[in-house]
Swiss-Prot record:
UniProt key word Transmembrane helix: yes
This protein's name: Cellulose synthase-like protein D2
UniProt KW Mitochondrion keyword: no
A Pfam family it matches: Cellulose_synt
């Protein structure tokens, strides 16, 4: 088979797959999928330094001895020359099944690189890490080499990693040499005895029979045909398998009961329908299914638990009462002016009007809170129980791709990321349906080797978790549990196993911590060797001439002695953070379809895993290409690169993204989220958001890091409308919702009461039928049927990616096991094995993560994560809700995920600053909720409007925090007198606020302390970070000044002496100035007010009490901030004293200048000292 202008000939020898490249005629990486051709594999040569270099045009010319009389045209003609070798008895193609298996073995051991103006290379990794890789799925796993002289290929291995040797003498031979030996007489090259089995498939063993019928004509199905075959209807599959159905085998394997089709068993619906019986016809049988399966009562996967009316009704009533009281109070304030201090009255009224609007925007979306519950037993019964459509009981759950993002190993410790990866690999979800993608946006070798170490340690950790039901499955968190680890453990070998795994984990931590030094020493050694070689070559070339010092860029070297294609420790051209090639490494290749049980400890393994499935999910390292001149779009761009590469490699219909410091705390969390997606009506759910829970927070939660009011009050309330907002991590997405498609059966909402009081549906039958037939729809198209020809303009020109879209849509549908399930799929459709990885697939994945792929497409505009905001998560969720998708809030009994949060005051303020800046950007962009479509409900629109408007409250909040001080300084108050009407309004507003807080605590489950901490930090953040966010947002909108933020540093868990050491570190930032000024001004004002009242001729105690009360209210909210300034030992930083002194002097001078003291010598009236 000849290549399409790839500059080389394709070879059948599997050992040559390690030297392959995917290139076009111009040497540039081709646009993927062009013309529907699969990427071709061509040769590359290996240099003396171990690097693989493709055969460019110059290389080919030099290889052929290009002379001066050879024209460029002749060189180009040679490049496009094709040779097709016909099949002969000595040149027979390898069996497709065996060839695919051989190729997958090499693909999983190869590091793929490529991108802009470069070919896609696959570099065989003989060694990925310094330590030995033992698991057969892992890249660089130990394998034997072929014993034939001159052959560098690896011996075929089985699923356990053991060598497959065709002769009893155990002579090691690869697949190609074995085929040559059979052709040349069939004798073993080692012992010279004839082979007993001369067919390679007899040696390797045939693969399990697929559950789908073979392709017509007996021809092997192509990759796309196999992937599309699952979309056949269940009726067609049942008819095609009628003759091959073995009832006895099914009864034996599923432990069923004899009855269906039995002479004693009555025929189903024989009277009514004339069908039924053993053939399964009629309604009772349900398309050939036994009635004992279809007669089961249908059970939902999820339930909506409404808030008790005894709590919700008073809560709604109080909201209405407080709304009315606020309106009356504001009207009274406007009518009754303070003529003595109009400036004070005017500022207070404006602030109170804004606070009333802000409270209304925050409170209205809380009218419809709900709770939800899942039933995992029903999920297992529907998707993993043997049925006629799934006789072997294979998992019928859809595939799930997990995205883990990291960018800087210095601020995000590799050990934290590795523990997150281990918790994902050990999750309780079908191994063959789970894939994990790690996005390293920094392209660091440290992250790469840390992930390889994690994959190696997973060989022991994951089976250990499955064997003993370990929770949590993050080793760092598990071994640091404060509770008894042996509680409820009944296996006699648990103590021995735990001790062994703990020792292995300690060694694993040491290896991770030593990686930076190991990489540095290795790079120094290889760099010294290269310098010596360069100097030697220079001396040989210069002879007696003066030799200048050789300067070679100091590269970063991998464990196998080759250059790292990503970012070097000392950045160089094409090896810097913003300039490096795309990299993909399959750390753990896709597992086999059937369970693979381990061996006993006597057979050489450290632990006894004889009854444990030792397979591991697929793990892929991805670092997208970055080049100068291309906008990388930060985290959103990295996520979109993962969406495209995962669509090509595994195409899971669902995606779950996690930050590198958020690990899986509940091993069944994936199943909990899948319950919502697979339930009736689940095809309209765009994403399932899990709450964020944090570890390492100080017991008092000084800075409201747990954020329970938002996650347990606001998010539960939004779940009763259209669903919660997307908060950036711990979210399960439907892939086609990320692709920008509309949900099925979407409708428009016109009224403001449709959220809590839905109107009767009036939908035309023809419209429903049309939407059921139309699986994929986009808002940009008015045609009834989707115009597939427009897909390349939206998604790019990758045919692999475009062809995967309808497959992902079909696989993401719920089961059609109930008449109420719309747009469902037949049971058993997802029990087919996944395709093996081949070189063209990974080469295509390299192409879709290149820097130029998104040019002239809608990625980041309407497709995938949305660009243009530092809070891309909120914007992405808003776009889905705006298209009509719903979201669900999944609160599990055991926390689904846990992560870390910055407990340092400065880090916390910068985190809030980033969130608030993103909200300001949203308000001034096209994503403003005022411009939302009619597919978004009214209260959902109010919630998103509040997201964009809340930072502006800081302007009025700061003014209002100074009003008590101004009142005390001036001797005036916001009202003329503290009369009964004002005090009554104030009392009612305060009481209703407290009662609402109590009821929120009642239905949300938070504590009063958490509610109060949230109130305190609302004022701290509102007077510091929110104000800075408004200023930065206005600068970006008006002046076009871009805003850059640094990553929040994650704790590596090394502070064993003090877990909360960061809490007491005082790091100065300009964000602290406004709260410090507010505190100092109010303290000085209280002192001035007391002194004036005491020494005045006519003391006005009512105004003093009013001003002092509000000043103390402000200071009470700022108490955590003041405590944070004192550090560990209660020492206030010197800069605070300096600011306080300057502030006191400034205020005193200003006050003397504005209001000079009177000439009355009798200060203080009749009061005299004794």
């Amino acid at each position: 088979m000849a290549s399409n202008g790839g500059g080389g000939l394709r070879h059948s020898n599997s050992s040559r797959l390690s030297r392959m490249s995917y290139s076009g005629e111009d040497g540039r990486s081709q646009a993927p999928g062009g013309g529907g051709d699969r990427p071709m594999v061509t040769f590359a040569r290996r240099t003396h330094s171990g690097r693989y270099v493709s055969y460019s045009r110059d290389d080919l010319d030099s290889e052929l001895g290009n002379s001066g009389d050879m024209s460029p045209e002749s060189g180009q003609e040679f490049l496009n020359y094709h040779v097709t070798i016909p099949a002969t008895p000595d040149n027979q193609p390898m069996d497709p099944a065996i060839s695919a298996r051989v190729e997958e073995q090499y693909v999983s051991n190869s590091l793929f690189t490529g991108g802009f103006n470069s070919v896609t290379r696959a570099h065989l990794m003989d060694k990925v890490i310094e330590s030995e890789a033992s698991h057969p799925q892992m890249a660089g796993a130990k394998g034997s080499s072929c014993a034939i002289n001159g052959c560098d290929a690896k011996v075929m291995s089985d699923e356990r990693g053991d060598d497959i040797l065709p002769c009893e003498c155990d002579f090691k031979i690869c697949a190609d040499c074995f085929a040559d030996a059979v052709k040349n007489g069939g004798a073993c090259p080692g012992c010279k005895d004839p082979y007993k089995a001369t067919e390679l498939d007899d040696v390797v063993g045939a693969r399990p029979t697929l559950s789908l019928p073979p392709p017509p004509g007996g021809l092997p199905a192509s990759r796309m045909e196999r992937r599309l075959s699952i979309m056949r209807s269940q009726k067609a599959m049942t008819r095609s398998q009628t003759g091959d159905w073995d009832h006895n085998r099914w009864l034996f394997e599923t432990k069923g009961t004899y009855g269906y089709g039995n002479a004693i068993w009555p025929k189903e619906n024989e009277v009514d329908n004339g069908g039924g019986g053993g053939g399964g016809g009629g309604l009772g049988g349900g398309d050939g299914q036994p009635a004992e399966f279809t007669s089961k009562p249908w059970r939902p996967l999820t339930r909506k638990l409404k808030i008790p009316a005894g709590v919700l009704s008073p809560y709604r009533l109080l909201i209405l009462i407080r709304m009315a009281v606020l309106g009356l109070f504001l009207a009274w304030r406007i009518k009754h002016k303070n003529e003595d201090a109009m400036w004070l009255w005017g500022m207070s009224v404006v602030c109170e009007l804004w606070f009333g609007l802000s409270w209304l925007l925050d409170q209205l979306p809380k009218l419809c809170p709900v709770n939800r519950a899942t039933d995992l037993a029903v999920l297992k019964d529907k998707f993993e129980t043997p049925t006629p459509s799934n006789p072997n009981g294979r998992s019928d759950l859809p595939g799930l791709d997990i995205f883990v993002s990291t960018a800087d190993p210095e601020k995000e410790p590799p050990l934290v990321t590795a523990n997150t990866i281990l918790s994902i690999l050990a999750a309780d979800y079908p191994v063959e349906k789970l894939s994990c993608y790690v996005s390293d946006d920094g392209g660091a070798l440290l992250t790469f080797e840390a992930m390889a170490e994690a994959a190696s340690f997973a060989n022991m950790w994951v089976p250990f978790c499955r064997k003993h039901d370990i929770e949590p499955r993050n080793p760092e968190s598990y071994f640091n549990l404060k509770r008894d680890p042996y509680k409820n453990k009944v296996r006699s070998d648990f103590v021995k196993d735990r001790r062994r795994v703990k020792r292995e984990y300690d060694e694993f931590k040491v290896r991770i911590n030593s990686l930076p030094d190991s990489i540095r020493r290795r790079s120094d050694a290889y760099h010294a060797r290269e310098e010596i070689k360069a100097m030697k070559r220079q001396r040989e070339a210069a002879l007696d001439d003066v030799v200048e010092a050789v300067k070679i860029p100091k590269a970063t070297w991998m464990a196998d002695g080759t250059h790292w294609p990503g970012t070097w420790i000392q950045p160089s051209a094409e090896h810097a953070r913003g300039d490096h090639a795309g990299i993909i490494q399959v750390m753990l290749k896709p597992p086999s379809d059937d369970p693979l049980y381990g061996t006993s400890s006597e057979e050489g393994r450290p632990l006894d895993f004889t009854e444990v499935d030792i397979r591991l999910p697929m793990l892929v390292y991805v670092s997208r290409e970055k080049r100068p001149g291309y906008d990388h779009n930060k985290k959103a761009g990295a996520m979109n690169a993962l969406v495209r590469s995962s669509a090509v490699m595994s195409n899971g219909p669902f995606i779950l993204n996690l930050d590198c410091d958020h690990y899986v705390y509940n091993s069944q969390a994936f199943r909990e989220g899948m319950c919502f997606m697979m339930d009736r009506g689940g095809d309209r759910i765009g994403y399932v958001q899990f709450p964020q829970r944090f570890e390492g927070i100080d017991p008092s939660d000084r800075y409201a890091n747990h954020n329970t009011v938002f996650f347990d009050v606001n998010m539960r309330a939004l779940d009763g409308i259209m669903g919660p907002v997307y908060v950036g991590t711990g979210c399960l997405f439907r892939r086609i919702a990320l692709y920008g498609f509309d949900p099925p059966r979407s409708k428009e909402h016109s009224g403001c009461c449709s959220c809590c009081f839905p109107q009767r549906r009036k939908v035309k039958t023809s419209t429903v039928a049309s939407e059921e037939r139309q699986a994929l729809r986009m808002a940009d198209f008015d045609d009834e049927e989707m115009n597939m020809s427009q897909f390349p303009k939206k998604f790019g020109n990758s045919n692999f990616l475009i062809n995967s879209i309808p497959i992902a849509e079909f696989q993401g549908r719920p089961l059609a096991d109930h008449p109420g399930v719309k747009n469902g799929r037949p049971p058993g459709a997802l029990t087919v094995p996944r395709d093996l990885l081949d070189a063209s697939t990974v080469a295509e994945a390299i192409s879709v993560i290149s820097c130029w792929y998104e040019d002239k497409t809608e990625w980041g505009q309407r497709v995938g994560w949305i660009y243009g905001s530092v809070t891309e998560d909120v914007v992405t969720g808003y776009r889905m809700h705006n298209r009509g998708w719903k979201s669900v809030y999944c609160v599990t009994k055991r926390d689904a995920f846990r992560g870390t949060a910055p407990i340092n005051l400065t880090d916390r303020l910068h985190q809030v600053l980033r969130w608030a800046t993103g909200s300001v950007e949203i308000f001034f962009s096209r994503n403003n909720a005022l411009l939302a479509s009619r597919k978004m409900k009214f209260l959902q629109r109010i919630a998103y409007l509040n997201v964009g408007i809340y930072p502006f409250t800081s302007i009025f909040l700061i003014v209002y925090c100074f009003l008590p001080a101004l009142s005390l300084f001036s001797g005036q108050f916001i009202v003329r007198t503290l009369n009964v009407t004002f005090l009554t309004y104030l009392l009612v507003i305060t009481l209703t606020m407290c009662m609402l807080a109590v009821l929120e605590i009642k239905w949300s489950g938070i504590s009063l302390e958490e509610w109060w901490r949230n109130e305190q930090f609302w004022l701290i953040g509102g007077t510091s970070a929110h104000l800075a966010a408004v200023l930065q947002g206005l600068l970006k909108v008006i002046a076009g000044i871009e805003i850059s933020f640094t990553l929040t540093s994650k704790s590596g868990g090394d502070e064993a002496d003090d877990e909360f050491a960061d809490l007491y570190i005082v790091k100065w930032t300009s964000l602290m100035i406004p709260p410090i000024v507010i505190m100092m001004v109010n303290l000085i004002a209280i002192a001035v007010g007391f002194s004036r009242t005491i020494y005045s001729e006519i003391p006005q105690w009512s105004k003093l009490l009013g001003g002092v009360f509000f000043s103390f209210w402000v200071l009470a909210h700022l108490y955590p901030f003041a405590k944070g300034l004192m550090g560990r030992r209660g020492r206030t930083p010197t800069i605070v004293f300096v600011w306080s002194g300057l502030l006191a002097i400034t205020i005193s001078l200003l006050w003397v200048a504005i209001n000079p003291p009177s000439q009355n010598s009798q200060i203080g009236g009749s009061f005299t000292f004794p």
